[in-house]
Amino acid sequence: MEVRASSSFVRTFGRRLLSPLALSSFLLFCVSNPALSQEPRIHKPPTPEPIEVTELPLPPTAPSSDLGACSTSINPHQTGCIDTAPLSFQSGSFLPDGDSALARVHFVGAPAAPDPASKYDGGQIIIVKADGTKFSNGDTWKCVTCGVPPQNAIGVGPDQGYPQSFLDGKRILEGSSIVDCSPYLLTDDRCTADRVHIYPIRWNIAPDGSGPGGNIRELRLHPDNVHLGFNGMSIGKDGFGQFGYFGRLVFNPSPQSGEPRAPRYDLTHVTRMVRQGPPAMTLERDPEHSDQLRLNFDAITVGEFRGFSKNGREAFYIGYPWESCNIDVFAVDMTTGKIRRLTSNPEYVDPLDSSPDDKWIVVEDTRGSDRQMFMAGMRGVPPIIDLLATAYVSSVRNNGPRRFFQAYLIDRYGDRGNYQGQLLTSGDGAPGSISDPNWNAMADPRWSQDGTRIVFWQAQVTSPSCGGSNPLPCPAPSEPGGRHFRMLIARFTSRIPLSVKPLAPVSDDIPWGTPYVPGTPLPKFTPIPEGTYTMRGKVAGSATVILKDGDDHRGLKRVYVSYKDYSDEPDCIINGTEEVTRLSSYSPTVFALDWHSNLVQSGKTQGTKITSSDGFKTSIDVFSNIFEATGTLTTTINGKTYRQPENGD
């Protein structure tokens, strides 16, 4: 039951002993092969622990975005009102003291200038009290970037995503900029708008150092606070591509080249997270048998960089799947290149953060929603059709702006047997509760420095992901002012606070990576030549694989696989066929497929993966994520059937 605290802004959802996620028992089956697990299955699952979830206080919501709508009757302190839209908000990290956390908000309804309250307008970074106290003005929040003079923010772009505090408590990484209030702490009353400077981050991609630099996204601060990781994206006639990068932040007070010619941070000693030479692939042609395919679990395939371990030694990433249609998070040692598979649940996982001692991770995952199970529910199938299907599969996880994530606590050794992590927001699913399925976790969750708390946020489903032609009705708003988001803290009440020493700066070099040289072309993966191949099961059986290129100069067009008693582990056998053909699309970000499956699984798991007689024809844009298909793809495991979403759902 929800318990309301004395403050109208604070809600405590109660303390519960949350059991590990009770997913279908089939998760026990067809996943014991050590090659498919990040650690040998010898570690006893952890005991469930008590978790208390509390909602943090946010600024009041404005009744509209009209000029002056944020009146003194709504906010007597005249410190701003925020929008209600779910994507107008994003929680960030804790500040180093653990008493406050960062958030990105969108202020609306401010009065016109010269009213002092006019500065509470547009996208801004705020600090939210997490310890029940208030700032000196009586608010539980403080806007750091509101009213910063234009001359203090030259060349700064609009991106304010994923706000992360530096350990000095004086700086914030927001989007592709750094907010700096030195010499004062961000929480200090002396940290006022006129003392704040916002510096853009520039990645030089031109041989002569000219221009504005390259586009960088999904920035994550390294624990040494000297380096950061980021993603660089390319969209062109050859399709959609992305690479992860690692570089050093260097403050440049007076740039002599490039734009902007204003104080900024430059990224130096940049390394692309790709092995030098032709990039390796998880599915590859056997170098000793050119007519055979094999799985190379040592291949580093950083599809999207997602962060770092707290000891600074590993980079986290979403990579090419180790099982068909199963998108997981991996960790790669930045010195040795050794890979760990952090998750193996067949659902989609993306946002994550590691605890200060690296004994736990918090992930946001679609597990429990069955969103991906119609594609990924059959375990032990090698990732062969994924040569064409991976981008499509990963894009089904969302319905437009809606995510189907929930937050889970997982120990270092990952998913194994019946242990599939501990859900942070367990409950009865009542409307408006933290377990309401119409409220979903959003990126990124963040640990406190002492390892006893996680800050994260949820968004409520809104149109167009519900209502209208969508089969899901839109739920009524349950938050103050009708906002569709909330900022939460999960407290691990039985844990003893950790004391973690600051990390010394790590090396600029990634020995296995490729040093970035401005102006050089992106690396190209060497595709497996078209032809007919055999892939042998590790235990028994084989698969016949036919790869066929298209005549549109875009490479692979068709993948056909026929399984004959294929088995990568004892008593887990795959028979049948799968075929995926790439269809023409109007955009490089749209993936259209003609998919045919007729698989049967036998042994300790009984299952089928079957398409309708005319196949499963489907397309999706990797940015808009709207599901559309004709025909059906259905997976049944041990009597439980998983079906695709409805179109537009």
Task: Annotate each PLM feature.
Residues N33-S37:
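Sec/Tat signal peptide C-region and signal peptidase I cleavage site
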Residues P20-V31:
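Bacterial N-terminal signal peptides
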Residues Q38-D649:
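Sequence signature of WD/YWTD-type beta-propeller architectures
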